[in-house]
């Protein structure tokens, strides 16, 4: 199994074994750090049913909230890409933007922070603030939600 050091992961959970953190590693504070957020499994690459691996779903704040990577109706028919080229997706097969948080809620998504609180974050949030909420140890504090 692949492993990563805790210092290599900016979020609360990591992709590989050993990459998760404990509360003491959340130096920006648990009320300033996203732990979980909404994802739309059909809106990412890696697998037609979502960005999924044996260990779970991967998502982050690298892409803007609700960035359109959803291969819906006009793009996909069963397991086939629409050959007409009328797809409205933005890089649904890109490692940089595909694993972003996204929701079917209008205007944003629900997030659980490391302190257990739940917040609706607007998709119009300042992108730098959004990224700050996604990093547990950057010493950059986001504006209050």
State each model region's role.
Residues 1-145:
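Surface-exposed loop/linker segments characteristic of extracytoplasmic
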